[in-house]
Amino acid sequence: MDLVALTYTSRSASGLTPRDVDLIHRAAITYNPLDGITGLLVYNGNGFMQIIEGAESAVDDLMSRITADIRHNELEVRDRRSQAERCFPHWSMYRVDVSPSFERGLSGVEDAVTQMIDASMRAVVVSSLAAISTPA
């Protein structure tokens, strides 16, 4: 199996509610195990940053569904890489809600996942959070 990790950012659609974000997360934790997907979902009130891990075909299929989802605007794939092993093997989709402020948002994500990602993935996370953050 070719294991890939894909990181994307998107702006949340206007009028997105906390319940909508809960529904996105619940769908991920329900369906991702069926497709062999694991990862991390970060929401900061402005947008999403997500790392999706799995077989290349499963990741591509999921990204097609996310791209078509009207709850996401300005979706941008920020990184795609082959991996020898998963960063988040036990998380069908771990969710971290953080502050819209870049500095506080980064701190929240680092607290949750710093031991699980390498330096190059950390750089992707930092630049991705910056893309969806508001000034401090």
Regions found by a protein language model. Give the residues of each.
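Charge-rich, low-complexity N-terminal segments
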Residues: 1-136
